[in-house]
């Protein structure tokens, strides 16, 4: 018996954020650690984050690489640190992001390329990796923070609290044998009840992402992707009677 569920599919992922606070020496300018000056406490924190020009990148192993636009929306320069990680978001993936470290001026953008350095991926389905970029704030003595006129831009952005933000998007390795798009086959996912959980079976070679999933008008939370040729279980809404429709 198969379950009637309503699912809205999307191939996009919002950025995964990791925030780290960096306390500058300016916060302790007057009176030491326990006696911060009024001017120091009035300084606002700034976030060093970057805007990516896409929510995902599809990589064809037969291509020469894929590009992604990196945008600095801030009014000050920052270093951009980039890397490609495996599905666990911990170990390095066999990709080279060129260049892995570069400066981006305020209100400026540039296109960067990811290139495969080898590795073995299945030929009959998508594989998922992660592209991560991190904005690094300048310090007062960083020469790269100088403007074109030689002015120290770092002095203007030296804050008592600086937030360095890392944003990650999906990199799908899609082999030539996998034709079509995920949107074209998303309706093929089969939904079943497994105890007090909802089971989605993905018979396609694509990663299927769910933006919304409802059962009987109630939203199913903790939505996650369903990997190719696999299944995933989701908690059913509490107190809801599940009705089946057989096919």
Swiss-Prot record:
Keywords: Chaperone, Immunoglobulin domain, Periplasm, Signal. It is found in: Periplasm. The keyword Amino-acid biosynthesis does not apply. Residues 106-125 are annotated as: Disordered. One of its GO terms (cellular component) is outer membrane-bounded periplasmic space. The keyword Ribosomal protein does not apply. Residues 1-29 form the signal peptide. PROSITE patterns: PILI_CHAPERONE (PS00635). It comes from the Bacteria. Belongs to the periplasmic pilus chaperone family. Involved in the biogenesis of the NFA-I adhesin. PANTHER family: CHAPERONE PROTEIN CAF1M (PTHR30251:SF9), PILUS ASSEMBLY CHAPERONE (PTHR30251). This is Chaperone protein NfaE. It comes from Escherichia coli.
